[in-house]
Regions:
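Positively charged n-region of N-terminal signal peptides that target proteins for export
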Residues: 1-7
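Bacterial N-terminal signal peptides
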Residues: 7-17
Length: 154
């Protein structure tokens, strides 16, 4: 009887340990994506198209208030300054993971130079990433204009 109880106890501890490690892995991946998203905003502000080209998936799409563009078009917009993402103040971030896909929501105030003017707009930005080998690639980025009281549900 003691052997059975000890065996069950060991199985329970092993199962709980595995769940804790899995939870730590998810938290690590979430933090990695939060950091990557923040870096992306800085690369956009710096017009660092080399770093962005490596991040953007070949089939990526970018949805803005005035249109939808592919990877090449988005990089051209950034490089030429047609839209200059000067500063993204990130107020909140939420991440959801499912296998090799991740969705990152950013609640931001974006200062951008557009059509000759500086504009400040509140957005919730939805980013979809896909894990390829050991790297996350941005598949889609969508800007949704929102009120400044909008909250991301966690």
């Amino acid at each position: 009887m003691k052997g059975t109880i000890t065996g069950i106890f060991i199985l329970l501890i092993t199962a709980l340990s595995g769940t804790a490690q899995q939870g730590e892995g998810v938290a690590k991946a979430e933090q990695e994506l939060i950091n990557l998203s923040k870096e992306k905003w800085q690369w956009m502000a710096d017009k660092n198209v080399d770093k962005l080209a490596a991040l953007f998936h070949e089939k990526s799409k970018f949805v803005h208030m005035s249109g939808t563009w592919n990877k090449k078009e988005e990089l051209d917009i950034i490089k030429t300054g047609s839209i200059w993402y000067k500063k993204a103040d990130v107020h909140d971030v939420a991440v959801e993971l499912e296998d090799n896909l991740a969705i990152v929501w950013n609640r931001i105030t974006l200062t951008a130079f557009v059509r000759g003017n500086d504009v400040v707009t509140e957005f919730t930005v939805t980013e979809v990433y896909k894990k390829q080998s050991s790297d996350w690639k941005l598949l889609a980025l969508t800007f949704s204009s929102v009120r400044d009281t909008h909250k991301i549900q966690h």
